[in-house]
Amino acid sequence: MAITRRGLAASGLLLGGPRPARARTQWRAASAWPVANPMAQLLRRFCEEVDEASGGAVQIQWHGGGDLLKSRDIRQALQQGAVQIGDISLAAHSQGNPLLELDTVPMLARTPDEARRLAAVTRAAIEQQLQREGLTLLYWAPWSGAGLFSRFAIDSVGSLRGTRMRSMTPVGARVAGLAGATVAQVEPEDVPRAFATRQASVMLASAITGVDSEAWQFASYFTTLSSSFSKNAVCAQSRAMDALPAPRRALLREVAGRCEAAGWDGLQAAQAAAQQVLSGHGMTLNPPSPKLVEDFERIGTIILGEWIERAGAPGQRLLDAYREG
């Protein structure tokens, strides 16, 4: 029987025997959120599942609690290759891009189902934007609904006039301005100090953020407004992702899909758990009054109109698709 080159290759005898095993991939992943935070834990799960599913061929060292990078630094570190995977707040680091701010517009998506539909409608456009910045979206996950942390009961936007409202997003800053509050730009890890030094007196944030910052130390009330459900994006540096062999890229995407589904499916449980922690530490959880809802709807309408002006026709098409959904 003739011995062919193809047969030699198949048997591993060509060029002196079998090819050496492909080199192990070793990456680093950074999250600024506290170790017990659901976002940080989801990224940890991603890293562990990738290691297990790849049989150790892809190892991603997880860094949580901001021990490697602060939230403000992760995006740039990703782009420069200091880390290969990072957990970033889209709205906080939008750099003026309206597309990345849409999920923080007040009263546009007030339930987990609405937030999930908005995410689905905007995903392709956001992926393209991130690619232009050298980032590849692996998965994203939502925060629980945004509410108001304060030392006093809030019945209307009038209650916010003259306060110092903590914000870390452009939309949040605009909300503060329209409510008659002074904006206090404060990163997540600096929230307790900002309240202790009176740099901030009110915060529009999720119950999960309240747990992270131990809001019971500086607030007595959490008004469960659910004005928006913002998202975090876990991204890979595109150059590092593209350099992976195709099977490894596929594996990362497969695990990312499972983590994204877990983030959405676990949202209501995470929100309930966070609210229970706040209540357990003596905070009063109040539903929003009809007047407060009306006031925030008015603010949301103004901000959405401004958003459409900046986003133009492409943004309007996304909004139409969301509303028709």
Model regions: which residues?
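N-terminal secretory/targeting leader peptides
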Residues: 2-3, 7-114, 126, 130-325
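A gly/proline- and charged-residue-enriched helix-loop-helix capping module
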Residues: 114-121
